[in-house]
């Protein structure tokens, strides 16, 4: 899980979602998981 000020899609499988007020990226590739923080 990467914590970044600005999250963006890295590949075409990445999905930008909101969970509990946080913007997150979920993907089939675990290296692409990100959270805004």
Swiss-Prot record:
Keywords: Ribonucleoprotein, Ribosomal protein. GO terms for biological process: translation. SUPFAM superfamilies: Ribosomal protein L36 (SSF57840). The keyword Lipoprotein does not apply. GO terms for molecular function: structural constituent of ribosome. GO terms for cellular component: cytoplasm; ribonucleoprotein complex; ribosome. InterPro entries: Ribosomal_bL36, Ribosomal_bL36_sp. The keyword Ribosomal protein applies. Belongs to the bacterial ribosomal protein bL36 family. This is Large ribosomal subunit protein bL36. It comes from Cyanothece sp. (strain PCC 7425 / ATCC 29141). The gene is rpmJ.
């Amino acid at each position: 899980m990467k914590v970044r000020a600005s999250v963006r899609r890295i590949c075409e499988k990445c999905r930008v979602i909101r969970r509990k007020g946080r913007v997150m990226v979920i993907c089939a590739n675990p290296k692409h998981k990100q959270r805004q923080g």
